[in-house]
Amino acid sequence: MAPSAQPLPVSVSDEKYANVKWEELAFKFVRTDYMYVAKCNHGESFQEGKILPFADLQLNPCAAVLQYGQGLYEGLKAYRTEDGRILLFRPDQNGLRLQAGADRLYMPYPSVDQFVSAIKQVALANKKWIPPPGKGTLYIRPILFGSGPILGSFPIPETTFTAFACPVGRYHKDNSGLNLKIEDQFRRAFPSGTGGVKSITNYCPVWIPLAEAKKQGFSDILFLDAATGKNIEELFAANVFMLKGNVVSTPTIAGTILPGVTRNCVMELCRDFGYQVEERTIPLVDFLDADEAFCTGTASIVTSIASVTFKDKKTGFKTGEETLAAKLYETLSDIQTGRVEDTKGWTVEIDRQG
């Protein structure tokens, strides 16, 4: 299953940086040097993982991930600070979310300690690919999937946990705010489905409306709930918030919305700032009456929503440096990149060497 190569010890290259034009970084795949692979046979615990040269994985055509879509992924970042430290942001929360998703998809999973260790190893092995401060981040993508062959029967004989990394720039390049299309035909998630976990099956089914929205000039899509078609849920890959007066609202999780790590942090910061924070069902009519709106996620961090368009009617929201979104972005980014003291205990330092 794993690439046919001997495991390599985690070591730091003499090169401080890879040969990359950091100013041109986008949010897309860039091949780096190493990846992590661990396997688990049915009825056993996950083996100790290995750092291997980045390579294609060998996969049985009857693997559960190919036959039935049994797979999950996570996403988190490594940050290089001005004083040369390497930081992760709440990796334990991603490990816990992976476990919740694995339970939902009937899969074994690594412990949180093994998950965090894997992320640290991948970051260190690819340290030269971590952009200079202010130029981007190292995006780390852990994946858990059914790698053993299965055809109409349980249990799966083998599960694989792997992680790779890519240097990335900002997910949304336009700092002026997103222009969203409210999708009124396709639905992202359904009650009692998998919308509350990062199942690999959640994403490509909505590529059609997303591609159409992009062709029409929109930044992204805001989805409505499947049950009524009247309440907002989330973007393609981000949670959504609204501000009305002193009240910050975000849709309640309820199994159809991903419990974002950034979402959780933003709610806590809003309370620190003196706002009333509520998780509730948000009718579209309420959302359209908001003073301000923004989305949150590992990729997007905190990004203002400039407008939403529903059935050709466009509604605008406040954007700019004086918005709550801007304050949240600055505060969260300062913590993540070590520019301010982390009084929350959210960051994990993994390397003290410059």
From Swiss-Prot:
Disruption phenotype: Reduced methionine-derived aliphatic glucosinolate accumulation, but increased levels of free methionine and S-methylmethionine.
Pfam families: Aminotran_4
Source domain of life: Eukaryota
SUPFAM superfamilies linked to this entry: D-aminoacid aminotransferase-like PLP-dependent enzymes (SSF56752)
Localization of this protein: Cytoplasm
Keywords associated with the record: Aminotransferase, Cytoplasm, Pyridoxal phosphate, Transferase
Signal sequence residues: none
EC number of the protein: 2.6.1.88
Cofactor(s) named in the record: pyridoxal 5'-phosphate
Gene3D superfamilies linked to this entry: 3.30.470.10, D-amino Acid Aminotransferase, subunit A, domain 2
Gene Ontology terms describing biological process: branched-chain amino acid metabolic process; glucosinolate biosynthetic process; response to light stimulus; response to wounding
Catalytic activity field: a 2-oxocarboxylate + L-methionine = 4-methylsulfanyl-2-oxobutanoate + an L-alpha-amino acid
GO cellular component: cytosol
Distribution of this protein across tissues and organs: Mostly expressed in phloem.
Induction trigger: Transient induction by wounding. Follows a diurnal rhythm.
GO MF: branched-chain-amino-acid transaminase activity; methionine-oxo-acid transaminase activity
Enzymatic class: transferase
Residues with N6-(pyridoxal phosphate)lysine modification: 198
Alphabetized InterPro entries for the sequence: Aminotrans_IV (IPR001544), Aminotransferase-like (IPR036038), B_amino_transII (IPR005786), BCAT-like_C (IPR043132), BCAT-like_N (IPR043131), BCAT_family (IPR033939)
Family: Belongs to the class-IV pyridoxal-phosphate-dependent aminotransferase family.
Described purpose of this protein according to its UniProt entry: Converts 2-oxo acids to branched-chain amino acids. Shows activity with L-Leu, L-Ile and L-Val as amino donors and alpha-keto-glutarate as an amino acceptor, but no activity for D-isomers of Leu, Ile, Val, Asp, Glu or Ala. Acts on methionine and its derivatives and the corresponding 2-oxo acids. Catalyzes the initial deamination of methionine to 4-methylthio-2-oxobutyrate as well as the transamination of other typical intermediates of the methionine chain elongation pathway.
The protein, known as: Methionine aminotransferase BCAT4
Name of the coding gene: BCAT4
